[in-house]
UniProtKB/Swiss-Prot annotation:
Signal peptide stretch: none
Name this polypeptide is given: Pentapeptide repeat protein QnrB4
Domain Pentapeptide repeat: residue ranges: 25-104, 117-191
Keyword entries, A-Z: Antibiotic resistance, Plasmid, Repeat
NCBIfam families in alphabetical order: penta_rpt_Qnr, penta_rpt_QnrB
GO biological process, one term: response to antibiotic
Classification via Pfam families: Pentapeptide, Pentapeptide_4
UniProt organism field: Escherichia coli
Amino acid sequence: MMTLALVGEKIDRNRFTGEKVENSTFFNCDFSGADLSGTEFIGCQFYDRESQKGCNFSRANLKDAIFKSCDLSMADFRNINALGIEIRHCRAQGSDFRGASFMNMITTRTWFCSAYITNTNLSYANFSKVVLEKCELWENRWMGTQVLGATFSGSDLSGGEFSSFDWRAANVTHCDLTNSELGDLDIRGVDLQGVKLDSYQASLLLERLGIAVMG
């Protein structure tokens, strides 16, 4: 277990592999290409409020990595290997996940995804074209999150806050949306095949179409 305060450092590839790091600050640090598989970060700050910059994790191996109660705002997570990653109770506003892989390819046509991103602020984060199928993605804040071409099919998105969220941009078929604040969801323009809603949400969405729900 270690506690550190690093500024502007390029992180060596194996420096933190499998380690547990608590209550540390990493300002403007470069984790690009680092092996962070199985590494656990608890209560760490990766966002420098003065410069308003996050850390660079691009192309890093984050397989089974854990971030709990961390500030990952504005982090660059492009093209990471993120199979089995856990991001819980974090701030990740404006972070960039384009090209991130949460999947295990078994053959060219069969794969599964694994990720646990929960109780996290994902406002204005970029998940364009990211595949997060059948993953645990509950109780997150998705305000203005960029999801063009993303697929969340079969994932648990329950308890989420989806204000200023473009439902038409992403695949949310077979998702659990119960107990979520659904923002501007218009059921006429979104494929909701297999989606789970609670009765309150269903009546709200029907009322938007001018249908009176009785009882």
